[in-house]
């Protein structure tokens, strides 16, 4: 009798886990389908940063540009200038205020920079997250406890139009990005190339062994 009960419990548990995994795969496939529907776009964004208690602590604005596959650029104009560029292989973060560039490989950066997923079809990238869907909102949660993020939400309609995205960090701080003035005009590949400015320090994280 005891063995029968244990077998029943294991069967139910396995069935539940299989259902969750299948739903996760469905959500990933649907999100990828929507993201791939629009090959390139440019948009202005407004950023709102809130503390874990919900208090607004910062706001910002800038431009977000994507060209699939694997290319994106984010120009942050306020509260201070920053530039983030993915050239498909490397992820560049330029902070003019401190005259420093940090560069990492896209493969290594996907954990801490989920924006990479908005342009990637690499299965290795997607397997690092659990994905659930609620209408036009997709919730991505990193599987690794070492990830600095707790959650990454993507708002995208069935036609592939990205409306916004948000992150929740481990400490509860949230970053909300709302997109507007979205266009799908052709974007030059030169936008996604980064040249290190003169007299700027380079922190090359590609050399750091994981």
Curated annotation (Swiss-Prot):
GO biological processes: lipoprotein localization to outer membrane; lipoprotein transport
GO cellular component: outer membrane-bounded periplasmic space
Signal sequence, start to end: 1-23
Transmembrane regions: none
Coiled coil: none
UniProt-listed InterPro entries: LolA/LolB/LppX (IPR029046), OM_lipoprot_carrier_LolA-like (IPR004564), OM_lipoprot_carrier_LolA_Pbac (IPR018323)
The organism's place on the tree of life at top rank: Bacteria
Cysteine disulfide links: none
Main location: periplasm
Keywords: Chaperone, Periplasm, Protein transport, Signal, Transport
Subcellular localization, as worded in the UniProt entry: Periplasm
Keyword Transport: yes
Record's function text: Participates in the translocation of lipoproteins from the inner membrane to the outer membrane. Only forms a complex with a lipoprotein if the residue after the N-terminal Cys is not an aspartate (The Asp acts as a targeting signal to indicate that the lipoprotein should stay in the inner membrane).
Family: Belongs to the LolA family.
Record's subunit section: Monomer.
The name this protein goes by in its record: Outer-membrane lipoprotein carrier protein
Species whose genome carries this gene: Haemophilus ducreyi (strain 35000HP / ATCC 700724)
Lineage: Bacteria, Pseudomonadati, Pseudomonadota, Gammaproteobacteria, Pasteurellales
